[in-house]
Amino acid sequence: MKRFAMSLAALLLVPVLSNQADAAPKTRYDATTQTCRVLSDGPLEWESRPWGQGGKLFKEVCKSCHTRNNDKGAPFLWVESKNPDAWNRVFATRYPKCAKNGSWNGMTQEQLLVLNDYLYRFAANSQDPNDSC
Protein backbone atom coordinates (compact mmCIF):
# COMPACT_ATOMS: atom_id res chain seq x y z
CA MET A 1 0.00 0.00 0.00
CA LYS A 2 2.84 2.34 0.86
CA ARG A 3 4.50 1.64 -2.48
CA PHE A 4 1.23 2.40 -4.29
CA ALA A 5 0.86 5.72 -2.46
CA MET A 6 4.44 6.71 -3.34
CA SER A 7 3.89 5.77 -7.00
CA LEU A 8 0.68 7.77 -7.13
CA ALA A 9 2.36 10.79 -5.54
CA ALA A 10 5.23 10.56 -8.03
CA LEU A 11 2.79 10.40 -10.95
CA LEU A 12 0.95 13.46 -9.68
CA LEU A 13 4.18 15.41 -9.28
CA VAL A 14 5.48 14.73 -12.80
CA PRO A 15 3.19 17.26 -14.56
CA VAL A 16 3.85 19.88 -11.90
CA LEU A 17 7.62 19.53 -12.09
CA SER A 18 7.73 19.28 -15.89
CA ASN A 19 6.30 22.77 -16.41
CA GLN A 20 9.48 24.78 -16.61
CA ALA A 21 9.35 28.54 -16.56
CA ASP A 22 10.70 30.20 -19.68
CA ALA A 23 11.46 33.87 -19.33
CA ALA A 24 12.45 34.46 -22.96
CA PRO A 25 10.13 36.72 -24.96
CA LYS A 26 7.46 34.74 -26.79
CA THR A 27 6.34 37.45 -29.21
CA ARG A 28 7.70 40.60 -30.83
CA TYR A 29 5.77 43.50 -32.32
CA ASP A 30 7.35 44.62 -35.58
CA ALA A 31 6.67 48.27 -36.39
CA THR A 32 7.80 48.01 -40.01
CA THR A 33 5.23 45.34 -40.90
CA GLN A 34 2.71 46.21 -38.15
CA THR A 35 2.58 42.54 -37.11
CA CYS A 36 3.14 40.51 -33.97
CA ARG A 37 5.74 37.83 -34.63
CA VAL A 38 5.48 34.63 -32.58
CA LEU A 39 8.98 33.60 -31.46
CA SER A 40 8.01 30.70 -29.20
CA ASP A 41 6.44 28.39 -31.77
CA GLY A 42 6.66 27.40 -35.40
CA PRO A 43 9.49 28.23 -37.78
CA LEU A 44 10.45 31.47 -35.99
CA GLU A 45 11.17 29.52 -32.81
CA TRP A 46 14.08 27.85 -34.63
CA GLU A 47 15.11 30.71 -36.93
CA SER A 48 15.38 33.26 -34.10
CA ARG A 49 17.94 31.17 -32.21
CA PRO A 50 21.75 31.38 -32.50
CA TRP A 51 21.85 28.32 -34.80
CA GLY A 52 18.91 29.52 -36.93
CA GLN A 53 18.93 32.00 -39.77
CA GLY A 54 18.86 35.01 -37.40
CA GLY A 55 21.97 33.96 -35.52
CA LYS A 56 23.78 33.03 -38.71
CA LEU A 57 22.96 36.39 -40.32
CA PHE A 58 24.26 38.23 -37.27
CA LYS A 59 27.54 36.30 -37.40
CA GLU A 60 28.00 36.43 -41.17
CA VAL A 61 26.65 39.89 -42.05
CA CYS A 62 26.79 42.09 -38.95
CA LYS A 63 29.94 40.68 -37.40
CA SER A 64 31.79 40.99 -40.72
CA CYS A 65 32.13 44.70 -39.84
CA HIS A 66 31.12 45.07 -36.19
CA THR A 67 34.12 43.31 -34.62
CA ARG A 68 36.69 44.65 -32.20
CA ASN A 69 39.41 46.76 -33.80
CA ASN A 70 37.83 46.65 -37.25
CA ASP A 71 39.16 48.86 -40.03
CA LYS A 72 35.71 50.06 -41.13
CA GLY A 73 35.00 52.32 -38.16
CA ALA A 74 31.95 50.27 -37.20
CA PRO A 75 31.27 50.06 -33.46
CA PHE A 76 31.74 46.66 -31.84
CA LEU A 77 28.39 44.90 -31.46
CA TRP A 78 27.18 41.80 -29.74
CA VAL A 79 23.65 40.57 -29.20
CA GLU A 80 23.42 42.23 -25.79
CA SER A 81 24.65 45.62 -27.03
CA LYS A 82 21.06 46.87 -26.86
CA ASN A 83 17.82 45.97 -25.12
CA PRO A 84 14.91 44.51 -27.15
CA ASP A 85 13.20 47.87 -27.72
CA ALA A 86 16.46 49.42 -28.91
CA TRP A 87 17.00 46.62 -31.44
CA ASN A 88 13.43 47.12 -32.69
CA ARG A 89 14.16 50.84 -33.06
CA VAL A 90 17.33 50.10 -35.07
CA PHE A 91 15.34 48.09 -37.61
CA ALA A 92 12.25 50.33 -37.64
CA THR A 93 14.12 53.61 -38.17
CA ARG A 94 17.23 52.23 -39.88
CA TYR A 95 19.36 54.92 -38.28
CA PRO A 96 22.77 53.16 -38.16
CA LYS A 97 25.32 54.11 -40.81
CA CYS A 98 25.35 50.56 -42.16
CA ALA A 99 21.61 50.76 -42.87
CA LYS A 100 21.98 54.12 -44.59
CA ASN A 101 25.06 53.29 -46.67
CA GLY A 102 23.48 50.24 -48.31
CA SER A 103 25.13 47.48 -46.31
CA TRP A 104 21.70 46.06 -45.51
CA ASN A 105 20.63 46.00 -49.17
CA GLY A 106 22.03 42.48 -49.60
CA MET A 107 19.39 41.11 -47.22
CA THR A 108 15.75 40.52 -48.04
CA GLN A 109 12.96 41.96 -45.90
CA GLU A 110 12.35 38.50 -44.42
CA GLN A 111 16.04 38.14 -43.51
CA LEU A 112 15.95 41.54 -41.79
CA LEU A 113 12.87 40.45 -39.83
CA VAL A 114 14.50 37.19 -38.71
CA LEU A 115 17.70 39.03 -37.77
CA ASN A 116 15.62 41.48 -35.71
CA ASP A 117 13.77 38.53 -34.11
CA TYR A 118 17.08 36.98 -33.07
CA LEU A 119 18.51 40.21 -31.66
CA TYR A 120 15.25 41.00 -29.86
CA ARG A 121 15.05 37.53 -28.35
CA PHE A 122 18.59 37.51 -26.94
CA ALA A 123 19.06 41.23 -26.25
CA ALA A 124 20.15 42.70 -22.93
CA ASN A 125 17.46 42.28 -20.27
CA SER A 126 15.30 40.27 -22.67
CA GLN A 127 14.56 37.51 -20.20
CA ASP A 128 11.37 39.21 -18.97
CA PRO A 129 8.16 37.22 -19.50
CA ASN A 130 6.05 40.40 -19.37
CA ASP A 131 7.90 42.14 -22.22
CA SER A 132 6.07 41.16 -25.39
CA CYS A 133 3.15 42.17 -27.62
Provide a role label for each language-model segment.
Residues 1-4:
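Positively charged n-region of N-terminal signal peptides that target proteins for export
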Residues 7-16:
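Bacterial N-terminal signal peptides
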Residues 17-23:
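Sec/Tat signal peptide C-region and signal peptidase I cleavage site
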Residues 25-57:
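Electrostatic cytochrome c docking/interface patches
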Residues 58-69, 115:
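The canonical Cys-X-X-Cys-His
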Residues 64-72, 92, 103:
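Detector for the c-type heme attachment site
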Residues 89-111:
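Short Fe-S-cluster ligation motifs
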Residues 105-133:
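C-terminal capping alpha-helices of c-type cytochrome domains
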